[in-house]
């Protein structure tokens, strides 16, 4: 990865959480400690961040997005990145798509930003997704407003729902906390309603979940598996789960 791409990647990571450590940069970019420090020095010299002990933070008065410990821990796992790459490969030039909130969908936004030669429109209710894509020259971007849920960085509620009802998408990409039997569930009913509307208004409906989400339960069931076109998951899905859930919809395993 050349220096220009490394610096772009570091800024993308900063946009998600507002702060970053040298260790996170080393792990994500597979570079040396010295290279990571030099890259941060270069970005600080350009006025794009402020160095801190062991890392850096964005030059912004805004409060960084609050995420749960689980979200922080799982943000850049290989499985989520692989799922995002597979989803990105299905998006065509000229598509209008919806991207919901969630760490796997943040990875999808990062994949889209790095892709060249495609012109698409993205509608999202996720602030982290918006912050990643808002300076892309090839993506027409629309952020749904509404009630803000800081824990996930998502806009929900009646305003978001009203705006979403008037929109149509070639593809919608959402996530879930739990998949069991024929049901898809999430913690927040308000987020579930938004994802339900987006799926209903899409020609192709995609659920992006890693294999740990199967045979789990959560509070609000917002969709049925047999209403989906495709589940995209990682290659660690068990043969039993693959057989069980394939009876409802198509399952694509990421490489």
UniProtKB/Swiss-Prot annotation:
GO term, biological process aspect, one: lactose metabolic process
Domain HTH deoR-type residues, every copy: 3-58
Family matches, as PANTHER family: GLYCEROL-3-PHOSPHATE REGULON REPRESSOR (PTHR30363:SF4), HTH-TYPE TRANSCRIPTIONAL REGULATOR SRLR-RELATED (PTHR30363)
A UniProt-annotated Pfam family: HTH_DeoR
One GO molecular-function entry: DNA binding
Protein name (database record): Lactose phosphotransferase system repressor
InterPro entries recorded: Carb_Metab_HTH_regulators (IPR050313), DeoR-like_C (IPR014036), DeoR_HTH (IPR001034), NagB/RpiA_transferase-like (IPR037171), Tscrpt_reg_HTH_DeoR_CS (IPR018356), WH-like_DNA-bd_sf (IPR036388), WH_DNA-bd_sf (IPR036390)
Extra remark beyond the main annotation: This gene was sequenced from pMG820, a laboratory-derived deletion of the naturally occurring plasmid pLP712.
UniProt DNA-binding region: 20-39
Keywords assigned by UniProt, alphabetized: DNA-binding, Lactose metabolism, Plasmid, Repressor, Transcription, Transcription regulation
SMART domains named among the record's database cross-references: DeoRC, HTH_DEOR
Function description: Repressor of the lactose catabolism operon. Galactose-6-phosphate is the inducer.
Signal peptide residues on this chain, from the entry's feature table: none
Gene that this polypeptide is encoded by: lacR
